[in-house]
Amino acid sequence: MQQFPLYKQHDSMLCGITCLRMVCKHFGVSYSAEFLSSLCIEGREGISLLALSKGSTRIGLKNECGLVGITEIQNILPCILHWNQNHFVVLYKVKKGKTFYIADPAKGLVKYNLEEFKKHWVSTQSGGEEKGIAMFLEPTPAFYEKKMDEEPKEERSFKFLFGYIKQYLKYYNAIKFNGMDINLENSIVNYIESICK
């Protein structure tokens, strides 16, 4: 079996985007993390499952998300899992219902036995069954027919850098620039946003 494509996240906020990127590559289409980030609206805590769902739909992936049992996740692989209640990983293979193969954008390709897997993934019990959150993805013909054009590299890189910096601005009220206090929210952010439009 061919090894599952692995990309590493460059930041703790990009685990969901990186998982979506790995699934796209598995299905035969390559996208940059920057481009996928532009399709998925980030929140303060990173990318939500809803944002991943909307972004994947825009590139032609049919998706279903929900609380499911361990038996159900083995039927449609690969799938994106909500892991440790604060991270996303891709489950790409299950061997005999006992060994679970994970593409973790923070750790790499990892395998877990059933008990270890449940410890990381299970978030609740419903009807006597242990369940966790999963997103199932399936390519539609549109996914293969028309790969969405990515923006020119220079512009894409600038937008990605701005998006990356913007999420950390909440930690700073002001900066010193040539001896003057400049309020980031009012000056730099507004200028950069006007360039990115």
Indicate where each model-derived feature is located:
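Cysteine-nucleophile protease catalytic domains, especially the papain-like/related folds used
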Residues: M1-V68, N75-L77, H82-F88
